[in-house]
Amino acid sequence: LHLLHNIDNEELAALYHGATALVYPSLHASFGTPIVEAMSVGTPVIAAKGSSHEEAGGSHTIYITPNDSNELAEKIDLVLNNEELRQNMIKRGKQYVTRFRAEVCAYNILNCYKRIGIDITDDRYF
């Protein structure tokens, strides 16, 4: 376990990529950005149930009951020792998180406006 502070984006991506798994048991996170960041570079994720983590990680993350250290240890052991599971989490996780890329989100927002009849490329909106 390493507690790091003031990590730049490039170093953070390298740390995620070099990790065997991201363990994210937080219950008080907002969206779960670390989950998406880890999955985007191919790092399997174990996260707590009951927050926005399920949206961030989808079905390609292993979820644990909050404050259950035995379950957490069991799931860490599972990810460390089941290569087929790890590779599946890596492959499907990378595919899943593409939905959170900036250009995909921007495209979806533009389409929402179009569906309600607003062309935000019109100069009136700037």
Enumerate the predicted regions with their spans.
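Nucleotide-activated donor-binding/catalytic signature segment of Leloir-type glycosyltransferases, i.e.
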Residues: 1-10
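Conserved acidic donor-binding segment of nucleotide-sugar-dependent glycosyltransferases
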Residues: 6, 62-69, 78-83
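Acidic donor-binding loop of glycosyltransferase active sites
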Residues: 14-33, 43-44
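Short glycine-rich donor-binding/catalytic loop of glycosyltransferases
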Residues: 27, 43-57, 66-69
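A short acidic/histidine/glycine-rich donor-binding loop in glycosyltransferase catalytic cores
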Residues: 44, 59-65, 78, 94-95
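A short, well-ordered alpha-helix in the C-terminal region of glycosyltransferases
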Residues: 71, 85-99, 111, 115
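C-terminal alpha-helical cap of glycosyltransferases
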Residues: 102-126
